[in-house]
Amino acid sequence: MKRRVVVTGLGAVTPIGNDVESFWNGVKEGKVGIGPITRFDTTGYKATLAAELKDFVAKDRMDPRTARRMEPFSQYAVVAALEAVENAGLKMEEEDPYMVG
């Protein structure tokens, strides 16, 4: 049996856009997501540039209590996945959980 994978929805949390629309607009405009590190003092480090997310507020896009219990990278993944599910028009309660994901 040959299995197929079908991409039906997109989600993005990136240094040039925190959703698919702003990410794609950033790509088309030639935006660069790399800049000076702002999350901590880089004095004493060789690296001073990074691709940091800007203006990302997890509690605006997912349950605030859940967001508080997650590391930032997990928040990024969950928010992107939620956007992809929404973008696909999936209603998970109507789907077989063993067939989608």
State the predicted function of each range.
Residues M1-G101:
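Conserved "HGTGT" condensation-loop signature of ketosynthase/thiolase-family condensing enzymes
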